[in-house]
Amino acid sequence: MKEMTGLHSLVSIENFIKQHKFSFIYISRPGCTVCHAVLPQLRIVLDQFPNIKLGHINADDVAEVAGRFSVFTVPVLLLFIDGTEFLREARFVHFEQLEQKLKRVYRLYEGE
C-alpha cells in the first residue's frame, strides 16, 4: 500500500507540495466514515504511480486547510504537479475515473 506522510501544519503542506513533482494531498476528518472507506482504495490506486507522493491532512488538526484549499467537505483529494493544483475530487470518489485521469496525467508529465 502507498506510503503516506502526515502533514500537520500549512507550512509542512506547502513544503510537501514544493518538494515533490507529483504531490497527492488527502484531507479528511477522524469522524468521517466516507474518509475511512476512501483512504485504503486511494492508497491501492496510487501504488501504480511510484512518483506520486501521498500526504495526509487531518482537517481538525489543521483548521486553516479549509481556507487555503477551499475545502467545504471531506474527504478531499488534490493532485499537485510542480506546485499547481491539477486535479480535485471530493466526498464521493469514482475510483475508476480517478485512475484513468491519473494515468493520462502521469504519462503526459512523466514523458517530459
Swiss-Prot record:
The alphabetized UniProt keywords are: Disulfide bond, Redox-active center
Pfam families the record matches: Thioredoxin
Q: List the disulfide bonds.
A: C32-C35
Spans traversing the lipid bilayer: none
InterPro entries, sorted? Thioredoxin-like_sf, Thioredoxin_domain
Residue ranges occupied by any Thioredoxin domain in the UniProt entry: 1-107
**Coiled coil region boundaries:** none
User: Could you say which residues form the signal peptide?
Assistant: none
Q: Which domain of life is it from?
A: Bacteria
Disulfide bond keyword on record: yes
Among Gene3D superfamilies, the record links this protein to: Glutaredoxin
User: What is the recorded name of this protein?
Assistant: Thioredoxin-like protein YdfQ
